[in-house]
Amino acid sequence: MPLAKIHVVEGRYDENRIAKVSGAVQAALMNTLRVPPEDFYQLIFEFPKKRFLHTPSFVGMHYTDDLIILDLTFIEGRSKETRLALLKDVNTRVAAAAGRPDDHALRSSRREFLLWSG
């Protein structure tokens, strides 16, 4: 049961554009982690610009007001290679959906299965 949290600045992403980003994240999870299509859990947050704070650039990446901050949480137990493949797949798909390769930052974490309920 992966959970994706998508954070954007209010007004920067219309319904169509956010749907593309959402679909890109889910497609990467299905492709890399082999989650079934019905295993779909996402929270989309829109923040006023004054509450969405970030550096203008970091490690060669240059951000605009279209920056997306992604937070992926999934059950532990997958290999390092699989986790790295997921990050690469999410990055590639979200960059294509959002329009700029620099405008997203991704954080992932793993949790014990016992900590999930559903």
List where the protein language model places each region.
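A domain-level signal for the structural core that forms small-molecule/cofactor-binding pockets
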Residues: 1-118
